[in-house]
């Protein structure tokens, strides 16, 4: 009996083992099937996402009513917007994603503009600083509507932001109108966008625009002895670099820019992003702005402002603006301020704390919201700095 029982128990154990093995095999097969479904779904999501991005970033004619000014997204029957320097950037995943991001930023910026009532000023629009038909090689001139004949007003040259990839001078129109209405001649300039070109070509465009202003500024009620160059965000980087390039023939040769033959009285930098190589995680975005081959270019050693400032003879008095809600550039603005001070530049920084207006003011708030109390105050303080610089210059 004992043997039979043991024998029966042995058979039962074997059956259970077989059942367990069968169940395990089925479970393994089921898990494989489950993973296959998950992978299939992920691949489908990726394909749909890629298709969505491609459709969202299709180029539109520069004559279309719904054109969006984003690099690589404007086409023409007569103008070639891409010059080859940005070759390969259109396939860069960061650039493709940011094209889509900037597209949706465009809607928000237009809504902000529609809600604002800029002052009426005299405007001369779409002047070509390079006669090639490229809409990005144009600028506007704005000055007070009540300017008297023979008047000579201090000049301000503005370079818009937009992450080097987005926007045109219209983005800063209301801001420039606010500046002009306070008694200035304002030049609002365009420049080509990444990925049609790279940051280097943008600096070339800015230099050409500055040279045009130097040659033609006297045609407007403009005192060319007093000029403040200003820019916000990416435009702040272009402004800061341009101020140095004005003073260094060696750097102009490296960057292949013309000599603007211009002397600045002051520099105004709003949330400048001037450290593109050593900017932490943000550099994943900023480094490709110099091209897919940025490491092989002569400009590679000069992608951060602290790498070029020693080439400047004497930068003009510089005013910097940032805010507690400026998550993109608060640290960069403070870092730039420290570099300027360390090199003996007369510099002031205004970092708007949350307590001042009971809110965390966003990135470039004074440019995008120039008629809000905080924006108005920021502009007034910056212009007071410019006035002080003019007074000091006149006393020399």
PLM regions with names:
Residues 1, 9-12, 51, 229:
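Exposed, low-complexity/repetitive linear segments and helix-based recognition motifs
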Residues 1, 18-20, 236, 395:
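Intrinsically disordered, low-complexity regions enriched in polar/acidic and amide residues
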Residues 3-34:
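N-terminal Lys/Arg-rich, disordered targeting/topogenic segments
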Residues 34, 38-396:
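Alpha/beta-hydrolase superfamily serine-hydrolase fold, recognizing
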